[in-house]
């Protein structure tokens, strides 16, 4: 089996990191941790 190029390995690692961060952000925004998020506009009602 021929070894893959280093550029392909780096590209896959960067893609996996971006997908992981995106998934974590969506989970934080819409999942159970979103109950602890504050809305700054609600804190400063006029």
UniProtKB/Swiss-Prot annotation:
Belongs to the PsbN family. It is a single-pass membrane protein. Pfam families: PsbN (PF02468). GO terms for biological process: photosynthesis. This is Protein PsbN. Keywords: Membrane, Thylakoid, Transmembrane, Transmembrane helix. May play a role in photosystem I and II biogenesis. The keyword Transferase does not apply. The chain crosses the membrane at residues 10-30. The keyword Transmembrane helix applies. GO terms for cellular component: plasma membrane-derived thylakoid membrane. It is found in: Cellular thylakoid membrane. InterPro entries: PSII_PsbN (IPR003398).
């Amino acid at each position: 089996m021929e070894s893959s190029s280093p550029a392909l390995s780096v590209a896959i690692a960067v893609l996996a990191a971006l997908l992981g961060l995106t998934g974590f952000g969506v989970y934080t925004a819409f999942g159970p941790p979103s109950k602890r998020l504050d809305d700054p506009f609600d804190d400063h009602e006029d």
